[in-house]
Amino acid sequence: MERRAEDDPDRSAGIYTAVISALITGGYANFDPWRPVTYIDATARSSAGPVAVKDVVTSPIPIEVQHRIGEALAAHTEVRFVDDPQSVIQPDSRVRDHGVLVTLAPVPPAGRLVRIGARSYSGNLGRNSCTFIVYGTGAQWQVTGTTGIYSMS
């Protein structure tokens, strides 16, 4: 029987932290790419990556996992999880508080290759979407590459 991702909060938080870090930093070395606030959709969505998904699967990100992600990223940004992603988009299409909105795909069960779709949005001309390949164990995970389409505007 496969273990569900939500059965191991360390694993889920480690994977999500690695993906969020890679999505936000994107390999930049000459400036700090972190926004003051990072809003994260509290619902994982299979449509988070750059590839169209016919049947969208959603799964709430458990509170314990949310807390661990917030703690792991606290040195870089203030993390706030939101139930309604549209609630942080201002009328001019920017994200509230000079922030960024991140949407993540669900973590696959243990024993499978970990590919996580993720997208960030900071305004009409500030979107990134990618599928990350993540490797590790327990709470120690790192992005080892990407696969498929990388979308940016």
Predicted ranges, named:
Residues 1-128, 148-153:
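Flexible low-complexity loop/turn motifs enriched in small/helix-breaking residues
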Residues 129-152:
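Short beta-strand edge/turn micro-motifs at domain boundaries
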